[in-house]
Amino acid sequence: MRKMLAAVSRVLSGVAQKPASRVLVASRHFANDATFEIKKCDLHRLEEGPPVTTVLTREDGLKYYRMMQTVRRMELKADQLYKQKIIRGFCHLCDGQEACCVGLEAGINPTDHLITAYRAHGFTFTRGLSVREILAELTGRRGGCAKGKGGSMHMYAKNFYGGNGIVGAQVPLGAGIALACKYNGKDEVCLTLYGDGAANQGQIFEAYNMAALWKLPCIFICENNRYGMGTSVERAAASTDYYKRGDFIPGLRVDGMDILCVREATKFAAAYCRSGKGPILMELQTYRYHGHSMSDPGVSYRTREEIQEVRSKSDPIMLLKDRMVNSNLASVEELKEIDVEVRKEIEDAAQFATADPEPPLEELGYHIYCNDPPFEVRGANQWIKFKSIS
């Protein structure tokens, strides 16, 4: 009898030590998956497009929610650090566009490739880098993903080729990466992203032509957030049907605020490229909450009411949250716990990013050359000992 009472006491004391919300979540039975209807994509030169229904598992839903919430909180922390003058220089935030970076990653393989423009923080995270490495790069510290030398626009990870500062210049590079995939006989694709502001660049159309001519496994992706700096798409383009811009290249127009739409469209586009049919073009209709960059308040060319309307009706995190709660894939309490954990992760990363030392002056020339080639090959001044170390 005493042993039984002791065992019961241990069980009850263990429950008492846990927060009530955790006990409630642990005892609740959730659905393993749910089927959702998603918006049909507009098609160009395609007879069939991505499915209009999709299955979301509880595991994937929780993962997507955590990732989008992490990107959102990371960008808000970057905004705070910039206003405190801890982050300097160019800084472009992507809050509001989380469904794009998380949804694209959900539709490809880790071995696939991705290159984008300067609004790159979210993609850097979804490609596998930690919040610590990203925030430390923003603050110019040694622990940053580019050793503190790249900043906001020049971050890199495995199979992620940046952050590129020149408008539209990454698109021919993306076609080149796709060429390498085909040349090496690899079943890989390259996601090549650019914004609506870059969509009128001539080099993009040249890349279209070469990719179609050589049937490269390249997914050209226009992130249409409706404004190129402060210019609306209607004032910048004679045709705002960016998914048709490839002309001879098939295209999709996708709801870029819905992570499930983005995921299914990406899977469809990747399968198209892997089949050897050549490139395909995706237009993601999305929206950024911040201005173009930190120097742009974002309300001189659009109203606060417009921004608030998008937040209230189309926010990608809220859309996923509502779906999961209403389909018994998760509870409000469980998602709140994730929010708390994400905030703590961001705060810890921010402390690291402000306490980590800056790179010393003697390391200014490090990481320029690969495999430490001799001076006569690199053509450098003999008295400047540039080094290449990893």
Swiss-Prot record:
Keywords: Acetylation, Carbohydrate metabolism, Glucose metabolism, Magnesium, Metal-binding, Mitochondrion, Oxidoreductase, Phosphoprotein, Pyruvate, Thiamine pyrophosphate, Transit peptide, Tricarboxylic acid cycle. Its EC number is 1.2.4.1. Thiamine diphosphate binds at Y118, R119, G165, V167, D196, G197, A198, N225, H292. The modification N6-succinyllysine is found at K63, K244, K277, K313, K385. InterPro entries: DH_E1 (IPR001017), PDH_E1_Alpha_Subunit (IPR050642), Pyrv_DH_E1_asu_subgrp-y (IPR017597), THDP-binding (IPR029061). It is an enzyme of class 1 (oxidoreductase). Residues 1-29 form a transit peptide. Pyruvate binds at H92, Y118, R119, A157, G165, V167, D196, G197, A198, N225, Y227. It comes from the Eukaryota. The keyword Plastid does not apply. GO terms for cellular component: mitochondrial matrix; nucleolus; pyruvate dehydrogenase complex. The modification Phosphotyrosine is found at Y301. It holds the Pfam family E1_dh. The pyruvate dehydrogenase complex catalyzes the overall conversion of pyruvate to acetyl-CoA and CO(2), and thereby links the glycolytic pathway to the tricarboxylic cycle. Heterotetramer of two PDHA1 and two PDHB subunits. The heterotetramer interacts with DLAT, and is part of the multimeric pyruvate dehydrogenase complex that contains multiple copies of pyruvate dehydrogenase (E1), dihydrolipoamide acetyltransferase (DLAT, E2) and lipoamide dehydrogenase (DLD, E3). These subunits are bound to an inner core composed of about 48 DLAT and 12 PDHX molecules. This is Pyruvate dehydrogenase E1 component subunit alpha, somatic form, mitochondrial.
